[in-house]
Swiss-Prot record:
It holds the Pfam family DNA_methylase. Residues 241-261 are annotated as: Disordered. Its EC number is 2.1.1.204. The gene is DNMT2. This is tRNA (cytosine(38)-C(5))-methyltransferase 2. It catalyses: cytidine(38) in tRNA + S-adenosyl-L-methionine = 5-methylcytidine(38) in tRNA + S-adenosyl-L-homocysteine + H(+). It is found in: Nucleus.
Amino acid sequence: MAEQELQRINEKKPWQVLEFYSGIGGMRYSLMASGIVSEVVEAFEINDSANDVYQHNFKHRPYQGNIQSLTAADLDKYNADAWLLSPPCQPYTRQGLQKHSGDARAFSFLRILELIPHTTKPPQMLFVENVVGFETSDTHMEMIGTLTKLDYVTQEFILSPLQFGVPYSRPRYFCLAKRKPLPFKSQHSNNKLLWSPDPLYGRDDQVEFGKCQAEEGLDKLLEFCKPVEKFLELAAHVDGEPSSVDDSENGSKDCCGQEGDSVPDSVHQYLVPVSLIERWGNAMDIVYPDSKRCCCFTKSYYRYVKGTGSLLATVQPKIKGKESCLKEQRLRYFTPREVANFHSFPEDFEFPKHISLRQRYAMLGNSLSVAVVAPLLRYLFDS
């Protein structure tokens, strides 16, 4: 295998890649951003609307069959060097039932693990992304056991966009696996779970599991993050200046898409209704254009305001936060384009017009951070 690897590098052949649970293309955008010479030979995704978005941007429609119906022979025909996987996270979330492998949504990933030893050419590399909590699940135990038996070496990470200069708190679990004799560039990190991206940049001052950054470490991270205003498509306004939002609207219009769920064609339709502010104001996470941290956007953003993502104050008060009247801060939702910006999607990414606003937020909430995944993939493919 090492000779084949050397031959590939010398001949500059593109890596052949399979993309599982492709969604709206976050993994593929990460692969492109990494600079790796590669070719996605097939993508797999069961969601029809997500495939519409993927096809719109990549001119290729993913295979839409059930992954559980795949056989080892099916996978062999792709002759892929690497498998990239972002399986459903619901079995492992804190809000979910935490059934782990007992959740039906985990079955397809378990099926893929079962197939690896039966393929004639197992992938040289695997990349798995999931929520924090996956690392303590029985599915994780099954995955590591399978990979170890098949001579894979793993390096695991829990990383957030905040560690890459993006003001977005979205910690996620990542597993990088390479089959012997392929080595990782930093072998000090073999078979460890790290909370630091240092190995990606050739540094060994790693933060291992259980030694997560303290608050002072987080404060230092935020110093290097860009402000929220760099990720906005709609003008931000500060210091109580008049908003470009149409003042004839009081924000009481339903922002949750109950009037056809069409995509707003004017700024005021992203304003948070006063009724929601009065009811849920204390539970809202408010950020400002100069903020350096934004909460994770979930698939329920725009449908619910509690715990689904940050809201932007379009009028910045003299005193920030809930001490000031929230209704006077003209809170609005971040637009889908802005959420895509926080996920570091490229400027040319777009949704087909028929995809509703709720669908856009839901798909973005299920996606991943290109800013985090691209350097991880670069590190994985680097020999």
